Amino acid sequence: MDPSADTWDLFSPLISLWINRFYIYLGFAVSISLWICVQIVIKTQGKNLQEKSVPKAAQDLMTNGYVSLQEKDIFVSGVKIFYGSQTGTAKGFATVLAEAVTSLDLPVAIINLKEYDPDDHLIEEVTSKNVCVFLVATYTDGLPTESAEWFCKWLEEASIDFRFGKTYLKGMRYAVFGLGNSAYASHFNKVGKNVDKWLWMLGAHRVMSRGEGDCDVVKSKHGSIEADFRAWKTKFISQLQALQKGERKKSCGGHCKKGKCESHQHGSEEREEGSHEQDELHHRDTEEEEPFESSSEEEFGGEDHQSLNSIVDVEDLGKIMDHVKKEKREKEQQEEKSGLFRNMGRNEDGERRAMITPALREALTKQGYQLIGSHSGVKLCRWTKSMLRGRGGCYKHTFYGIESHRCMETTPSLACANKCVFCWRHHTNPVGTEWRWKMDQPEMILKEAIENHQNMIKQFKGVPGVKAERFEEGMTVKHCALSLVGEPIMYPEINRFLKLLHQCKISSFLVTNAQFPAEIRNLEPVTQLYVSVDASTKDSLKKIDRPLFKDFWQRFLDSLKALAVKQQRTVYRLTLVKAWNVDELQAYAQLVSLGNPDFIEVKGVTYCGESSASSLTMAHVPWHEEVVQFVHELVDLIPEYEIACEHEHSNCLLIAHRKFKIGGEWWTWIDYNRFQELIQEYEDSGGSKTFSAKDYMARTPHWALFGASERGFDPKDTRHQRKNKSKAISGC
């Protein structure tokens, strides 16, 4: 048998397969393709059956033999509300906003910026799908509140630090509402603007235009800061609802000027890509132009602005800015002509807005004020209550013979031009540099002031300890202290009001904060005119009084000079704040020479309790011995004056000019009946028959003098002291 033939028979099938391998591969490929097609058809038919059997909103997908519900897209996972507050207003707004957000079934968190570390946590908001809301207030000198100080410092530094870059917060969504007072024009809502700007510079996306709340009821867009916030909140909730649905409302690309949004135009998205770098460069060069502000309510129109939607050369930015400014001015002029600006500071009826807003009314009512009309108030002094019980009167009783239980403390103007750190009213009253509110007539103010005062006195009828004769006397007002709150001299009809007081045989004690020299010069004669001298240098006055006027120091000096020409009794009121203004003796002496006052009251600051608006504590209240030491040192520098009286209970001393020391006796008290005769003669003569302070002075009793054993306490009354004696913490 041939071996080669056997070998051929063994390998011949394999050789045949090799020769026909192409056809074999082709068959396999066709088979696999057919199998894949069959599987696709089967799955497609199964999916169609599921779509028909299950509601569209809850379609199921078959995955590895299991049924799973299709996940719904989440566009907003929650809202974080950050607040920086000093007096609690921003915190209150945060709570109100949180309630509104909760109604949308969204998780919400309220965060105090004081407890938040942006270095560790702010970057988390890039991917969190949260919307971050910042409610920030502007405080003294345009600075942030204490609670927001670190956050703002960090954010500012990060916005200009190249290590963070322009996209550090890209993906973060935010909105800003600022709280401020346009009376401080140069710093109005500065913190809100800055936070908005810095977030934008770091790449965060603004979901709506910045809101600005204004405490100035006249300039406030909606009449009060609360109304401003409500209007902004409504828009924010509407925007939030749209974001929840995944809708993309047209929002600002960050290239707007002075609240005018350009992003509504066609091609704005392309412009955002192309001109972002140029806008940021221009912003850093001209910060005041605010290219980061926006508004979804206003649009630029016309062909002139189409050029702004394309890439702009850096060299042309100046021309563009001039063009925008010009158009803005033209638009404002057109609005003014059309009467849009006539309603500034007016209500829906076209009348001037009332000074007292609902929130202010609530705050002052809680403090015990009886509010009168739209801008006045009256309150019962604690010394009135004390003297009704026969427990002694205030320092004005000791120094000038006022009957404290017959003294009405009131003001025709709750507004003030300062925000003094030691203000008793915790800065709940409005501020302003001129009268811009609705004005009530002086006759109505005086009538209601007396009625309200009498009603408060009536509440003491039958109260244990109240003396019947004092109660009856208290029903007849004999003195009026225009020192309650605010700046009474701002009231345009203050002279008429004073004349009405004198016609009612009521003496007048008017206190002014030395910021209105012209009004002081034009003031009609009063029984006694006070000027608050809270500091003796420009820097310390700014620190303590926090005035609105930019030229506050010159106004202060001019007010003191205006006092020098007054013929009636004039008084400097010095309030000592420990560690703030007690080391300026020489400067105080120089101020005395400007106004040559008849008297100088030196009083330790009154502690009014804790307040978020003030940093004063009991540590700032000087002991009476410290006040006495200060007065001794001051008198050594002003040779025409001596220490006359003391009221230890009020932590107060009186320095008097030597002209009131006659025959070795002090005549600091007032003959009130004689004053009424003199003022009547003055009025009858049309102002030609003048009189001076010495014409109605009266001898000071021995118990009121400095050095007397009574220390200013009237021996007719019964001394009442608390068991735990401490610093004097209240006064009038």
Curated annotation (Swiss-Prot):
A Pfam family assignment: Radical_SAM
PROSITE patterns registered for this protein in UniProt: FLAVODOXIN_LIKE, RADICAL_SAM
Molecular function in Gene Ontology: 4 iron, 4 sulfur cluster binding; FMN binding; metal ion binding; tRNA-4-demethylwyosine synthase activity
Catalytic activity entry: N(1)-methylguanosine(37) in tRNA(Phe) + pyruvate + S-adenosyl-L-methionine = 4-demethylwyosine(37) in tRNA(Phe) + 5'-deoxyadenosine + L-methionine + CO2 + H2O
Record note on cofactor: Binds 1 [4Fe-4S] cluster. The cluster is coordinated with 3 cysteines and an exchangeable S-adenosyl-L-methionine.
Region (Disordered): 248-314
Keywords for this protein: 4Fe-4S, Iron, Iron-sulfur, Lyase, Metal-binding, Nucleotide-binding, S-adenosyl-L-methionine, tRNA processing
Enzyme Commission numbers on file: 4.1.3.44
Alphabetized InterPro entries for the sequence: Aldolase_TIM, Flavdoxin-like, Flavodoxin/NO_synth, Flavoprotein-like_sf, rSAM, tRNA_wybutosine-synth, tRNA_wybutosine-synthase
Amino acids binding [4Fe-4S] cluster: 416, 420, 423
Compositionally biased tracts (Acidic residues): 287-301
Cofactor(s) for this UniProt protein: [4Fe-4S] cluster
Taxonomy, superkingdom: Eukaryota
Gene3D superfamilies linked to this entry: 3.40.50.360, Aldolase class I (3.20.20.70)
Pathway assignment: tRNA modification; wybutosine-tRNA(Phe) biosynthesis
Basic and acidic residues composition bias: residue spans: 259-286
Binding positions (FMN): 85-89, 176-208
Domain Radical SAM core: 400-644
GO biological process, one term: wybutosine biosynthetic process
Start and end residues of each Flavodoxin-like domain: 79-237
Family of this protein: Belongs to the TYW1 family.
Annotated function: Probable component of the wybutosine biosynthesis pathway. Wybutosine is a hyper modified guanosine with a tricyclic base found at the 3'-position adjacent to the anticodon of eukaryotic phenylalanine tRNA. Catalyzes the condensation of N-methylguanine with 2 carbon atoms from pyruvate to form the tricyclic 4-demethylwyosine, an intermediate in wybutosine biosynthesis.
Protein name per Swiss-Prot or TrEMBL: S-adenosyl-L-methionine-dependent tRNA 4-demethylwyosine synthase TYW1
